[in-house]
Design a protein with these regions (language model features):
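Catalytic center-proximal scaffold of phosphoryl-transfer enzymes
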Residues: 1-282
């Protein structure tokens, strides 16, 4: 993150130095940041080619207005976009007509309908269940929370389980969910949760048990956005759209490097070297 800020608290990428996920960026390197757009687009193409894509979003500040930072990731790459909207058009534009096999996200409506199947983040739903429990529901939420934690435990054990065993667990969990949805909570929050699960979630809870390369939670997407949340609080955002786009490209390169066991410094240097290497070979 380029964390050096101006007197009004807004970050400018032309400042003398800063940091990218804790990495110092020297003055001479900042002029090269425009060169990272092409490597970032190669990362986007890698994510689009994946059968399983996970996505999340968090707010950003650009020229004093609320924008949104989106992340689209697969096992080996993460692409960041900072856009003026939280609408469905952002993932639609990112995909460019591609339809992956599975999409992993929270329950935001803008995240729906982009893949053949959808896996809701079970960690989010476990928190929703705990909220209903804290507000007095004893009929649906406690058992629903236990069911989701059971599903996550099966997910962690998949490396040691045969495909047939995983399929049996999925059928068992689906039967238990069906019985749970027959319950009638009397507490308001319990009813809201049960109705939401019945209407929107019942076919999006255990999709990850159909694929070994899918996860039950969206924790990796949240982790990819965490440095940006800190950045927003420290700097109060960007004074230009150019700065926001450059920062998103940097996030793409650094987080993709992390997923491939490369340091932020190595990932950025490799990205900046790519155009020169291609030119040399031309």
């Amino acid at each position: 993150m380029i964390s050096k800020s101006t007197s009004d608290g807004a970050a400018t990428p032309r400042q003398a130095s800063g940091s990218v996920s804790g990495l110092a960026v020297m003055k001479g390197e900042l002029g090269s940041l425009q060169a990272i757009a092409a490597p970032a687009e190669r990362i986007a193409a890698e994510v689009r080619a994946s059968e399983v894509i996970a996505s999340d979003e968090t707010s950003a500040r650009v020229k004093g207005k609320t924008w949104w930072q989106w992340t689209f990731g697969c096992a080996t790459a993460v692409y960041h976009v900072i856009a003026p909207t939280r609408g469905k058009c952002v993932p639609t534009d990112f995909l460019g007509g591609v339809k992956p096999k599975m999409w992993l996200s929270d329950r935001l409506a803008a995240q729906l309908g982009h893949a053949e199947e959808h896996q809701f983040c079970l960690a989010h739903l476990i928190r929703d269940a705990q909220y209903a429990i804290d507000h007095g529901d004893t009929i649906f939420a406690p058992a629903f929370k236990a069911l989701l934690k059971d599903a996550c435990a099966v997910g962690r054990r998949r490396p040691d389980l045969a495909d047939a065993t995983i399929a049996a667990h999925r059928r068992r969990l689906e039967r238990q969910l069906e019985r749970l949805l027959a319950r009638k909570p009397t507490d308001t929050e319990g009813r809201k949760l049960r109705d939401a699960v019945y209407v929107d979630c019942s076919d999006k809870l255990f999709v990850f048990l159909k694929r070994r390369d899918a996860e039950p939670t969206n924790n990796e997407s949240e982790r990819a956005l965490r440095p940006s949340v800190i950045f927003r609080k420290v700097t109060n955002g960007f004074r230009s759209e150019w700065g926001a786009k450059t920062y998103a490209a940097l996030c793409s390169i650094v987080e993709t490097g992390r997923r491939n066991s490369r340091s932020a410094l190595t990932a950025i240097r490799e990205a900046l070297a790519l155009p020169a290497a291609h030119a040399a070979g031309a």
